């Protein structure tokens, strides 16, 4: 605005001087040059002066035109300056705005750099955790595999034990039935002998004594078999307890938790869904496992009780009376010539006919023994399924005929007393 005021004032100052100068030009003496012929000497001076005045007027006109041009240029320059000042102000404002935006961007950039550093640290931590979890998963899988192998070995041993127990039970039930048949035959023979030799009261009394002793021996064998079955049931229950179902369940739970955490870290949705389904069905799995263990224990107890009804008996030499010819009975003379004389303590042909095999082993043929995997304990590590190390305190498990076995001292004493009594008679 000040530049515009200066241009207006300069033009207003030049305007009156210009008008005066133009008026002087109109009243110039050059017009009256032809009329003034009188004063020739002074006219030359005046003409020279007029020429000078003309020159000055021309220069004045040139200067006025130049001044006007300069004034117009000045006005243009002032307008340009005003425009430039306006542009400068606008640019200053824009510069301030850009500076503020730049500062904001710098702040955001610094915040982003901080976030990036934090995220990089978190990424490194999560990577380390993922490595640790992968190591734990590998270790847990190896432990699970070893435990599954132990469980399979225990199942194989348990199945072999059950098979051997069933074979023993069937074998000894057959032996008991055979012995019962033999006892029936012997009773028939004894009854026939009592009918044929009713006069010999002393021999009948000896037979009764021997039968009583035989019954006592049978009772002793039954008691030994009951003890044997009780010890077998204890061994079976102990082997079932050593499975340690709760520790297996805890290991399964830890593995499921590790898998779930690993899947959450890796964002595996399918694995999480399957793991959630397994965890939801965990109660049913635990109940089925407990029911299976209970049924196995109950079946073992039922087998132990049923084995009490089918006891094993040793091949004992049965007693027969020496036949003496009776003069009153004619039929006995014909039979006595055909029959061999037998001692009172000779073995029955049904019992003595069996031959002892050369390769006698404490296990039934067809049963494969495998090494036990369970840990030895203080109470049950010394006991064995097939034989006992201390025959005086606990009875041994019955074996098939022809296999060496131990008998209690009381049973041996009774057999010796039977032999002595027969020799005396």
Swiss-Prot record:
Residues in coiled coil: 68-197
Renumbered residue ranges of the record's region Disordered: 24-45, 322-425
Record bears the keyword Signal: no
Record field: compositional bias (Low complexity): 326-338
Pfam families from the UniProt entry: SHE3
GO MF term set: RNA binding
Localization, UniProt: Endoplasmic reticulum membrane
Entry's transmembrane regions: none
Protein name, per record: SWI5-dependent HO expression protein 3
Organism: Saccharomyces cerevisiae (strain YJM789) (Baker's yeast)
Gene name in the database record: SHE3
């Amino acid at each position: 605005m000040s530049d515009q005021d200066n241009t207006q004032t300069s033009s207003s100052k030049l305007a009156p001087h210009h008008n005066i100068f133009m008026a002087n030009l109109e009243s110039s003496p050059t017009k009256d040059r032809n009329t003034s012929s009188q004063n020739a000497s002074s006219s030359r001076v005046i003409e020279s002066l007029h020429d000078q005045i003309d020159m000055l007027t021309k220069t004045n006109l040139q200067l006025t035109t130049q001044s006007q041009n300069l004034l117009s240029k000045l006005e243009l320059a002032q307008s340009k300056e005003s425009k430039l000042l306006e542009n400068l102000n606008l640019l200053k404002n824009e510069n301030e705005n850009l500076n503020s935006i730049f500062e904001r961007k710098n702040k955001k950039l610094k915040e982003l750099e901080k976030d990036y550093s934090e995220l990089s640290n978190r990424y490194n931590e999560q990577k380390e955790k993922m490595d640790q979890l992968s190591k734990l998963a590998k270790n847990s899988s190896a432990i699970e595999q070893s435990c599954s192998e132990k469980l399979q070995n225990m199942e194989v041993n348990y199945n072999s034990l059950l098979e051997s127990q069933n074979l023993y039970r069937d074998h000894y039930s057959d032996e008991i039935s055979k012995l019962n048949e033999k006892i029936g035959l012997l009773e028939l023979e004894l009854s026939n002998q009592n009918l044929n030799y009713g006069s010999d009261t002393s021999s009948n009394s000896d037979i009764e004594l021997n039968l009583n002793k035989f019954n006592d021996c049978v009772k002793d064998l039954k008691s030994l078999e009951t003890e044997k079955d009780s010890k077998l049931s204890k061994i079976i229950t102990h082997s079932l307890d050593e499975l340690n179902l709760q520790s297996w369940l805890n290991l399964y739970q830890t593995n499921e938790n590790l898998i779930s955490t690993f899947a959450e870290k890796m964002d595996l949705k399918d694995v999480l869904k399957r793991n959630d389904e397994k965890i939801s069905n965990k109660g049913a799995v635990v109940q089925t496992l407990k029911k299976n263990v209970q049924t196995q224990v109950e079946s073992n107890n039922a087998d132990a009780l049923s084995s009490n009804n089918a006891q094993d008996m040793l091949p004992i030499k049965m007693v027969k009376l020496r036949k003496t010819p009776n003069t009153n009975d004619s039929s006995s003379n014909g039979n006595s010539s055909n029959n061999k004389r037998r001692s009172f303590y000779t073995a029955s042909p049904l019992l003595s006919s069996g031959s002892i095999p050369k390769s006698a082993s404490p296990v039934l043929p067809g049963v494969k023994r495998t090494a036990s995997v369970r840990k030895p304990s203080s109470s049950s590590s010394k006991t064995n399924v097939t034989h006992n190390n201390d025959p005086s305190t606990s009875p041994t498990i019955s074996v098939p005929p022809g296999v060496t076995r131990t008998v209690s001292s009381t049973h041996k004493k009774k057999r010796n007393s039977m032999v002595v009594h027969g020799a005396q008679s």
